Amino acid sequence: MHDLVGKVIERNGQCRVLEVGAGHGTFTDHLVAAGAEVEVTEMSAPSAAVLRHRFRNNPHVTVIHDSEGKEIFRPEPLDAVVCISVLHHIPDYLGAVEHLIQRIKPGGVFFSIQDPLWYPRRSGLSMNLDHGAYLLWRLGQGELRRGLATRVRRLRGRYDETNEADMSEYHVVRQGVDEVALQGLLAPVFHDVELQRYWSTQSGVLQALGERFAPATTFGLFARNRC
């Protein structure tokens, strides 16, 4: 990330970053340390409050509570867009990314990571190992019943509109995130687009095993040097 921001500053003289869905600001710290001016948007009011408190004395961070997800459609130009585990929360993620690309200035970058691969392109082994790892993690958390109930609803294609776990994780409704379609949006307007597929799960032990033996479940995209 330091290298990313540094190269943008070298080309453009600054690096103004929009971080979509910043959570509690862990990644924001790295961006600021690298020399970026960061605007973070967060749909969750409690998370936005945590961010405001965390960066209350930092003039290089602006926090916006964006409950309706509309702030990303503003016209102001940007040097970089960062999306950490957030595209699968956006109903029309392709439309959102297409607009964000238009805001990125020449020489800028787009970076996203930790979104689930498009289900129709995944093997049965990939899906089954992913589901099994999730249930084992829930068991370790003492929440196996909750995990099983969520999985059963998803397998049946029936979703509880009152349940945040169902309705904020849009990828389970629309079968993941189409990484190839996103790559197709980025490729014509960036000089270099890298798609990385990898295994990812919540359990540290299962993560270590999966990195060695399991098929990919998740992806990241890194588009450099906007045309």
Region roles according to the model:
Residues 1-14:
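Conserved alpha-helix/loop element of class I SAM-dependent methyltransferases that forms part
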Residues 13-23, 109-151:
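Conserved class I S-adenosyl-L-methionine
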Residues 24-70:
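Class I SAM-dependent methyltransferase SAM/SAH-binding core
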Residues 94-106:
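A short glycine-rich, Lys/Arg-flanked "PGG" loop and its adjoining helix->strand segment in the class I
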Residues 173-190, 195:
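Short alpha-helix
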Residues 189-191, 206-227:
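Core SAM-dependent methyltransferase catalytic element
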